[in-house]
Amino acid sequence: MDKKDNIILAFESSCDETSVAVVKNGNEILSNIVATQVASHQRFGGVVPEVASRHHIEQITYCIQDALDEANVDYEDLDAVAVTYGPGLVGALLVGVAAAKAIAFAHNLPLIPVNHMAGHIYAARFIGEIKFPALALLVSGGHTELVYMPEENKFQIIGETRDDAAGEAFDKVGRVMGMKYPSGKEIDELAKTGKDTFNFPRAMEKEDNFDFSFSGLKSAFINTVHHASQIGEKLDKADLATSFEQSVVDVLSSKTVKALGHFKVKQLILAGGVAANQGLRTRLDKELTAFKDVELLKAPLKLCGDNAAMIGAAGYVAFKHGVRADMTLNAEPSLEFEWMVEK
């Protein structure tokens, strides 16, 4: 390795993916090991925290060794250890934090605390350079946020969901339709074949703010399906999927466009698990044609879900800015972005 290179060992365990990665200079993936737990949670229709924690404990050591082996590096090649410490499930977070602290302590390496959502944003570094000021649309199972970044490693939430996250709504709607967890991809594929015939609500779309709400849409969808079931009416699943997805995409895109009109930025970053949705990606491509000076940077499809490579990218940025943690670092399940903004 070139001595000018920064090699970071990164950990991600905030929910139901155990992931360890080795990342060089914040933009090159040397390895990215992901042990998924989807099969274990499918029968419950969602993530069970206790089950997730146990799986992390079982897999973390194997993931560490696999990541080092695939990257062909040893501990002495590392410059730092980065770890997600929030937000997320507390038991799950603790596994990754404990492992990262142990390695940092044993090998006398700097420990870098990383906000999980910052990781999603910086996954875009694997596509290209992030230019500031920037706006990020973060859409996942647990969060839906518009984040303004005036400069590198500075974050300001300008809009967020008042209730359910968009990804959570996708999974609950999928369960009502009899789909397996997680159901976002299946809904997205089905939505390509249907029509928007149900006209589901677009909550808060016209309000003069950048916030979101998806609980009303979720309830309207569930009520529509249940009512049809009670009267023996058969609904077209493709039309249901299209109508639901269009409602979500309409709200996400309209709020993002509104934010772009208020904040002069160089880039719009689309990130998070729902960023893999083709309907949303296509809509933002279309909307950005009206903003000639704004570049759309979309997280790579394979890095939209939870993974440690994105934590390595965010960790590299934090490392450059002198962000460090000591051995008292603990999991913060309700961590927000404000801690990263200089007041």
From Swiss-Prot:
Keyword Transferase: yes
Required cofactor(s): Fe(2+)
Compartment list: Cytoplasm
First-listed, main subcellular location of the protein, grouped into a coarse class: cytoplasm
GO MF annotations, alphabetized: iron ion binding; N(6)-L-threonylcarbamoyladenine synthase activity
UniProt xrefs under InterPro entries: ATPase_NBD, Gcp-like_dom, KAE1/TsaD, Peptidase_M22_CS, TsaD
Protein name as annotated: tRNA N6-adenosine threonylcarbamoyltransferase
Organism, scientific name: Ligilactobacillus salivarius (strain UCC118) (Lactobacillus salivarius)
